[in-house]
Amino acid sequence: AGLKTVQAGETVLDIGSGGGIDCFEAARLVGPTGRVIGIDVTDTMLEIARKNATVVAMNLGYSASNVEFRKGLADAMPVDDGTIDLIISNCVINLAPDKRKVFREMYRVAKPGGRFTISDIVSDQTVPQYLVHDTQKWGDCLSGALTLTDYMKGMTAAGFLGIHLVKVSPWQVIDGLHFFSVTLTGYRLSQAPTASSARYATLRGPFSRLVDERGTTYRRGIPQPINPDDELLLNAPPFAEHFLLTTEPVTFDNHDPRWTAVLPAQAPCTWRGHYALLAGPFVEAADDDHHVYRRGEPLEICSKTVAVLETERYTPHFVILNRAGNRVSGEAVTCAPEGGCC
């Protein structure tokens, strides 16, 4: 997924490059003026990748290879500070003993204005010790899985912002723990200009309230003062589609076409074992049915809420899992007059 955003002339870093397949595709996308660096700890993989680099360059019509393979660990990368436009990785950080150190290394090597798009395995609950020390599960990228909450918190603590879900698919369920393959993107923001073109941000929806990674709260239809750093972040995807940025405060209500909302059906709901995990780029969000979602934390939801979160406006921000399987044959529940069912 990370390769879809590669721009010509960029410098791309692949953590855990193996035989170099992703690096060679990145080499084609960045063109002869770009660079690609692959990091791996395995001598055999490095040897294979280096042998193929010259052949790939020739096939691409380049006068010399623009790919370099270096031996190193993910938590101590042989890469200079602030030199990378895009960091990619595929199910490698999961295997690192200290993932937070890897996140800090990623931030160190990223350019201001750089980004990452990485795929990895995460879980919905903390992996218990008997699985952590299961050597087979470790090799299957399960024992080292962080919860989605801890993974995204670690990225934020390292300095990245705008961390959000690009893709998700179920991986395995073991002893009631749900493991997911996720692709996440985030940014090391560049220095904001001293002068801002926007001074206010008004949340359009579909959420009724949001809290961003800096702790700023936005309420739908109500202008919130912002600074140049806020503007820089809110102009990045996927924030931009949710906000109206203006030089003067703009207030609007549900009669305004800029207001967006997805309301639950006015009907009874059923409980079928579904849980929703907010997957960024916000740390907290509220919908129009009194649910408050916190990033990465499972919240049990009923069938009506599942239908809401599976709509086009909501689905990019959530992982939805079912802990009950096919064991539920629940009866419909009538929602409370003054609030939601769940």
Descriptions of predicted regions:
Residues 11-76:
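Class I SAM-dependent methyltransferase SAM/SAH-binding core
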Residues 26, 91, 105-107, 155:
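Class I S-adenosylmethionine-dependent transferase superfamily signal
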Residues 75-86:
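A short acidic, Gly/Pro-enriched loop at the edge of an enzyme's catalytic core
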Residues 85-98:
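A short SAM/SAH-binding and catalytic strip from SAM-dependent methyltransferases
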